[in-house]
């Protein structure tokens, strides 16, 4: 198996992996989405809400606010099902408070965490509008969870792969260049009067170029066992950490099967 990193930011990672099968790469994708733990608001204690918005709606909005947590702090928290408490405690949760008086808009940045290790990723997410003399006071309790339980715990906003494209020109090409105009993603270009591939990895294999070529001189396909994998997050977890954790989870599952087969 070979892996080549193509792009990496705080919220996105793109890499090319070859020498693997669809079931393997799809297992990584599903674990990234559904089984990698992430911190999100689970409980809201509403002490005062004068806004023209139901408590339940506001609580739902709070649950979808992305929270950035220091990796070491997040690792120290217990999963709720592993904790001995009834609902939440300091070992499995972190508290955020919000107090604001109108008029004005309440933003995610108004949430004050009990620890500097946890804070909203984006401070400018509008939550609710307060009128004159309206007040809002609440406590939000964040816990670890996984995406299969609720979308708010999904660390990825997009996690997908596609086959690595392949484009070939035959000797029948009459250099009409119609294929270049037909390509919607600027994958093809011109060089010395001939069509050439200039951005292969951007190809979606839509075959618009094939349909535009009367000579059928273009063959568009994919390389077997080679994929372009893209991970995007909401900023709460680094995409590299998501991938590493997903691999750890997959390895643990495989080791459990091995132990079972060996009769352990």
Swiss-Prot record:
Keyword Cytoplasm carried by entry: yes
Catalytic activity: RNA(n) + a ribonucleoside 5'-triphosphate = RNA(n+1) + diphosphate
GO molecular function: 3 iron, 4 sulfur cluster binding; DNA binding; DNA-directed RNA polymerase activity; metal ion binding; protein dimerization activity
Pfam families: Fer4_10 (PF13237), RNA_pol_A_bac (PF01000), RNA_pol_L (PF01193)
Family indicated by similarity: Belongs to the archaeal Rpo3/eukaryotic RPB3 RNA polymerase subunit family.
Source species taxonomy: Archaea, Methanobacteriati, Methanobacteriota, Methanomada group, Methanobacteria
Co-factor(s): [3Fe-4S] cluster
Name recorded for this polypeptide: DNA-directed RNA polymerase subunit Rpo3
GO terms for biological process, alphabetical: DNA-templated transcription
Organism: Methanothermobacter thermautotrophicus (strain ATCC 29096 / DSM 1053 / JCM 10044 / NBRC 100330 / Delta H) (Methanobacterium thermoautotrophicum)
Quaternary organization: Part of the RNA polymerase complex.
Function summary: DNA-dependent RNA polymerase (RNAP) catalyzes the transcription of DNA into RNA using the four ribonucleoside triphosphates as substrates.
Keywords (A to Z) from UniProt: 3Fe-4S, Cytoplasm, DNA-directed RNA polymerase, Iron, Iron-sulfur, Metal-binding, Nucleotidyltransferase, Transcription, Transferase
Superkingdom field: Archaea
Subcellular location: Cytoplasm
